[in-house]
Amino acid sequence: VQIGDSHTAGDLFTGAWRSEGQQRYGRGGRGVLPAGRPYRGYMTMGVTAGQTDGWTTNSLMGRQYSKDGPALGFTGFTQTARISGAKLTLAADNSNFTFDKFSLCGVTGPEMGAVRVILGSVTQEFSFSAPKIDAACFDVLSSNLESRVEVETLSDQPVSLTSWTTMRSSGGLIISNLG
């Protein structure tokens, strides 16, 4: 994981390291990213993130920061939806970034909602409802390399997602960039 400034966020150095390293050691996946598109101009090399209306962002800094907002995860961003049917998508730009393992992390708590994750032919539902505020990650596995994953909220209860990760279960190098 490289944590840095806007050059890191834009994947300028890490993208080149990832490309060279994965050619040499195997393509392990794109790695951890903020869920969705947390800000205007958000760049991702190798994958394209998308989202429908209905999501708001709490950020570690800048105009999107809210001290009263949901907890922030490892990526420094949390995407929250309070409507049923809000979607986030992540698609591999080419076969170098296909994946068979997807991990989704978010904030848990008494009033939190649930999501449906679709990875190829695999569909699973996960609830973020819990007795106390905490965090949880859920994994979805496919028997095939997939090029797209979709996350959809299932109710009007809030869902606050802190990160998602794509990997290949066959192993290889993963370099994540967070800035």
Predicted features and spans:
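N-terminal hydrophobic targeting/anchoring segments and the immediately downstream early-domain regions
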Residues: V1, S19-E20
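Second-shell loop/turn segments in exported
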Residues: Q2-T8
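Glycan-recognition surfaces in beta-rich domains, encompassing non-catalytic CBMs
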Residues: G4, Q22-G179
